[in-house]
A protein has these predicted regions:
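Flexible loop/hinge segments at secondary-structure junctions
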Residues: 1-193
Length: 193
């Protein structure tokens, strides 16, 4: 299938999308943020979503099986290599791999917004998701190291602007939200944003 088969204004080039397997959280996020959101924009599918949520999910959650979508496994380095070999292909993987390989590949803009640290942190780049960490309150003080782990995870050293988690690709919360999370960890309460 060619891009021009979808829209005549698109180039007559073969569609090739390299992505993760069904077991991947990145794929789950892509299905939810891109495929489901896109399906909701199609009138007949929006109607189906209201009438039969299970059927709607079966439609938007299915990847093509005609060769346009290629499961490239969990190895993001392999996807980068394949993108270098075929500059017309698209790859689905986390921002940290784009950032590490920006000399070889470029990110896709979504609604006119390029993927960047700032655009992801602000929520402006639509194809990004938050990372949630859950701890049972009943485990704090019972499971050795649980409170210490939570304290460390939200510490300035770990999650601060110059912390080791952002150095590994994590986009930290904006300061105000991070402060709320730190208070929740300290007080043993939940936080919703």
């Amino acid at each position: 299938m060619m891009w021009s088969d979808i829209d005549a204004s698109l180039p007559a080039k073969k569609i090739e999308v390299l992505g993760p397997p069904p077991t991947s959280g990145t794929r789950d996020a892509f299905v939810e943020l891109v495929m489901e959101a896109g399906a909701e924009e199609i009138e007949s599918l929006a109607k189906l979503a209201k009438e039969d949520k299970k059927a709607f999910k079966a439609v938007f959650g299915s990847m093509r099986e005609d060769g346009a979508f290629v499961e490239a496994g969990e190895n993001d380095n392999l996807i980068v290599q394949k993108l270098e070999a075929n500059p017309d292909a698209f790859g689905i993987f986390g921002y940290s791999f784009l950032e590490e390989n920006q000399d070889k590949i470029k990110g896709a803009s979504v609604n006119g917004v390029q993927p960047s640290f700032e655009a992801i942190a602000s929520g402006e780049y639509a194809v990004s998701r938050s990372l949630f960490v859950y701890a049972k309150k009943a485990h704090i003080g019972v499971i050795p190291g649980m409170q210490e782990f939570m304290d460390e995870f939200v510490s300035e050293k770990a999650m601060g602007e110059d912390g080791y988690l952002p150095a590994k690709g994590l986009i930290p919360l904006p300061a105000e939200e991070l402060s709320k999370v730190r208070d929740a960890v300290k007080n043993g309460t939940g936080v919703s944003m």
